[in-house]
Amino acid sequence: MRRRLQHVLICGLWLAMLAVRAPAMPAAEARIAVAANFAGPMQRLVPLFESATGHRLLVAVGSTGALHAQIRHGAPFDVFLAGDTTTPAMLRAAGVGVEGYSFTYATGRLVLWSGDPRLVDGEWRRLAIANPALAPYGKAAIETLGHLGLIEQVRSRLVQGENIAQTLQFVASGNAQLGFVALSQVMQDGRMTAGSMWRVPREWHAAIAQDALLLQRGRDNPAAVAFLEFLRGARAREVMQRFGYEFPAEGS
């Protein structure tokens, strides 16, 4: 009887040691396509997510329209963080996105910005906007100019960026004195980083609601699914809020 108990104990200890030594499930890797306006917050979110989960994220930034085209042509992305709601809806309709895995992660704000603290109300020669066919913030800029009845008046002085990041660069470099950009590009930690700006009234253009979408390639990717859950959480929202983003009401 004693030998039998001893044998059971030894077997139990051996199994326990195997359990302790068993390697943890390997971390996964996800590729995230990110609209250019969200590049700043994403730089903050990636290390927070990776530290919390052990997963790894690879990020590609571009205009919503350009990323949409890449995804439709088979680019290997698992998650799409768009600058609008229309583009993710088109991907879902085309069967590229996963039904039930899409939500509005933030609402952006359009601002008129100058690198010169004195120039928002001063003289200017060039006005930069993002390509309205590719960038939701460019579309909002055109809607704003239309609301003011200024499209024809300023048309000859417009310079157009491929995306909102290039639009900001036009203004920051002095190639344009003013530009319609995303608030998130010129605000960090609740403060304007440089220059001067004017927040465009929300009612002057369609709301810039921004949807996240799980793509078919990421359906069974634990890192992709975990990142979308992380994006809904309080920690991620705190980061986004510091860049000027707003959020839809609960249940909307």
Residue positions per predicted region:
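N-terminal secretory signal peptides that target proteins for export/translocation
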Residues: 1-3
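Bacterial N-terminal signal peptides
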Residues: 8-20
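Exported/periplasmic ABC-transporter solute-binding proteins
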Residues: 25-73, 81-85, 89-252
